[in-house]
Amino acid sequence: MSIDIDWERATSGPDGELLAERIRSFIHDKFQQIVLPRFIRSVQVTSFNFGTIPPELEIRDLCDPFPDFYEEDDNENFSESSEEQSPTREPVDRYGSKVESWQANSPGSLEDHMQGRMGFNGPLRMPPGEENTGISPLRSPMNFGDINPYLFPRSRTPGIPGGTSNLGYYMPLSGLSGSQTPLGTVARGSPFSGGWPDVHGARPSRRRSEVEPDSAQSRPSTANTGNTLLSRGSMSSGDPRHSHHSQGVPGSDHGQVLEPNMPPTSSDPPLDDLPPRRMREQKAEDFQVFCRTKYAGNISLSLTAEILLDYPMPSFVGLPLKLNITGLTFDAVAVIAYIRRRIHFCFLSPEDADALIGPEIGSGGGEDTLEPNSPRRKPLSLLREIRVESEIGRKENGKQALKNVGKVEKFVLEQVRRIFEEEFVYPSFWTFLV
């Protein structure tokens, strides 16, 4: 079943301009995290435009949502019931245990409280269970798990800027892709689809950012956009295709740091005591749509940079570079899941699309279509073609000093493909609160 999109209405007007600016700012932030070659300096993304040609959408299948979409974030302190009301929370320590009443109800310091019980001259002793536990280095004085993540900005995690309405981002750093991703086993009906993976060794580290309106943080921008509020996950930003598995250090999300050769302190719980993954309850109204998306339009993206020349000495002079992406060809399978006021969105890699829908859809059809039992010749990129124009040097008498430097174009296009595939292809996905 095909879907018609009013592309002009969706991408024009104040809302369309604001969305384009947020996408521009997001891509700009990603380029600031890239290690540039020695001959390129100061990459800036200056503009983004949706163009006038809409994508073609075709619904291929409806099914139950992926299990990953039901997982709650570690920093997410609201459930379905707490979205409407915020009940009083009992004080807990950093491991989730309830704090004893002598500690929770004491208005003063611990020393004042203990001296008030035993008399001013009485010896100060710690309560049972707290003796000889040592002091954890760099331990945070507050339990960040009990603070609403929307209250405090933490701006180092990349995400969609500009305060878009209730947008979230989630990306496991397990490095799974293609035939190694669990999607292939889901399609074959393995135990992965019947229950949640084990927390030890099977749970990948992940990164998540939440974007809410009306905050004091904003991205670098060339336009006046809305503000954004970001929250940081437990992993720092980096190459998501490398595995960054958790080392099993309890309390690492709350500021505690252990050296690799340092034995754990007695206050650290064993790994078997770690809480299980928190999953939302599955309901009958939850659903997921597989939608084939084809695009061959005139979307545009403009970048500027400086090209450094090393003659007669290193970094002797910088030439201005202007690079314009004037269109692209795109063919992939999108996943849209609706789970109780949340919409999860991502694309499938060609291998995953082959396993779940079929080789004709996964490979994009046409001349790239393979026979059902034939091996894939080469992994395909979702961005099939990117049209680019580049200018290096200033115009003099209507002529360019340099044109179409292939090395610079190749580097920029590789980064555009990498950003797209790392941020939008499963197991990375985006979450919208509706």
From Swiss-Prot:
Question: What's an example GO cellular component term for this entry?
Answer: ERMES complex
Predominant place of localization: mitochondrion
Biased composition regions of type Acidic residues, renumbered to the chain: 70-83
Annotated GO biological processes are: mitochondrial genome maintenance; mitochondrion-endoplasmic reticulum membrane tethering; phospholipid transport; protein insertion into mitochondrial outer membrane
What segments bear the compositional bias annotation Basic and acidic residues?
A: 86-97
Instruction: Please list every transmembrane segment annotated in the UniProt record, as residue ranges.
Output: none
**What is this protein for, i.e. what is its function?**
Component of the ERMES/MDM complex, which serves as a molecular tether to connect the endoplasmic reticulum (ER) and mitochondria. Components of this complex are involved in the control of mitochondrial shape and protein biogenesis, and function in nonvesicular lipid trafficking between the ER and mitochondria. MDM12 is required for the interaction of the ER-resident membrane protein MMM1 and the outer mitochondrial membrane-resident beta-barrel protein MDM10.
Fill in the subunit field for this protein.
Component of the ER-mitochondria encounter structure (ERMES) or MDM complex, composed of MMM1, MDM10, MDM12 and MDM34. A MMM1 homodimer associates with one molecule of MDM12 on each side in a pairwise head-to-tail manner, and the SMP-LTD domains of MMM1 and MDM12 generate a continuous hydrophobic tunnel for phospholipid trafficking.
Tell me what this protein is called. Answer: Mitochondrial distribution and morphology protein 12
Query: What is the native source organism of this protein?
Result: Ajellomyces dermatitidis (strain ER-3 / ATCC MYA-2586)
Q: What is the lineage of its organism?
A: Eukaryota, Fungi, Dikarya, Ascomycota, Pezizomycotina
